Structures are given as C-alpha cells and as structure tokens.
Amino acid sequence: MEFVAKLFKFFKDLLGKFLGNN
C-alpha cells in the first residue's frame, strides 16, 4: 500500500500547486 500512499501524495501536491498558483 506504500505505492498508493505515494501516488495519493503526488496528486495531492500536484493539485496544491495548481490551486496555489491561481
């Protein structure tokens, strides 16, 4: 399940970057 946790964090950080830029 470590892969899922990393994948979730990746999308979370990516989404945060998009929302933070706007």
Swiss-Prot record:
Induction: Up-regulated by agr.
One GO process term, biological-process aspect: killing of cells of another organism
Pfam families cross-referenced by the UniProt entry: PSMalpha (PF17063)
Keyword set, alphabetical order: Cytolysis, Formylation, Virulence
InterPro entries registered for this protein in UniProt: PSM_alpha, PSM_alpha_peptides
Modification sites for N-formylmethionine: 1
Function: Peptide which can recruit, activate and subsequently lyse human neutrophils, thus eliminating the main cellular defense against infection. Stimulates the secretion of the chemotactic factor interleukin-8 (IL-8). Showed the most pronounced pro-inflammatory and cytolytic activities in the host, thus contributing greatly to virulence and possibly to the development of disease.
Miscellaneous note of the record: Peptide production is higher in most prevalent community-associated MRSA strains than in hospital-associated MRSA strains.
Family membership: Belongs to the phenol-soluble modulin alpha peptides family.
Name the record gives this protein: Phenol-soluble modulin alpha 3 peptide
